[in-house]
């Protein structure tokens, strides 16, 4: 039986999530890929402002529980700051992999992406995801590029 309220919210029928529009980073993309892994039917919307009546998971925008763009953003004991992906993984990882494997995955995969997002420290996977962002003169939408990147991240 699921005791994780966030996991229940993600897995419910007609589940929804919201994140920022515009340029995206690996933490946004892997957050969306994680949500889609847990519920392939979840609707993920991007926008400039979270609608007041939105009832779903909000990440990397809106100053909520899964947004790290705040003055009092959390930092791990080892000094690596959380980004959206790390905040979601912290809440969901143990349910998915168990405590020991979730911690190892956090250290090896999530933390480097979080660190890249917060500090700009070089990360090849983050650079790959960043390359999906359209150039200023390219056709197509940021949303289309975002969901292409999410598709690659979810492979």
Q: Where do the protein language model's features map onto the residues?
A:
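Short, intrinsically disordered, charge-balanced linker/junction segments flanking boundaries
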Residues: 149-155
């Amino acid at each position: 039986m699921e005791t994780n309220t966030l996991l229940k919210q993600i897995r419910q029928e007609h589940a929804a999530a919201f994140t920022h529009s515009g340029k995206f980073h690996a933490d946004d993309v892997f957050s969306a890929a994680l949500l889609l892994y847990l519920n392939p039917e979840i609707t993920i919307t991007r926008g400039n402002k979270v609608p007041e009546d939105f009832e779903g998971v909000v990440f990397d925008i809106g100053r909520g529980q899964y947004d790290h763009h705040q003055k009092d953003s959390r930092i791990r004991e080892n000094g690596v700051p959380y980004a959206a992906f790390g905040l979601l993984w912290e809440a969901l990882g143990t349910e998915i992999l168990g405590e020991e494997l979730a911690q190892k995955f956090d250290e090896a995969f999530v933390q480097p992406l979080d660190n890249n997002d917060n500090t700009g420290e070089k990360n090849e996977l983050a650079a790959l995801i960043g390359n999906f962002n359209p150039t200023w003169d390219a056709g197509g939408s940021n949303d289309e590029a975002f969901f292409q990147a999410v598709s690659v991240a979810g492979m």
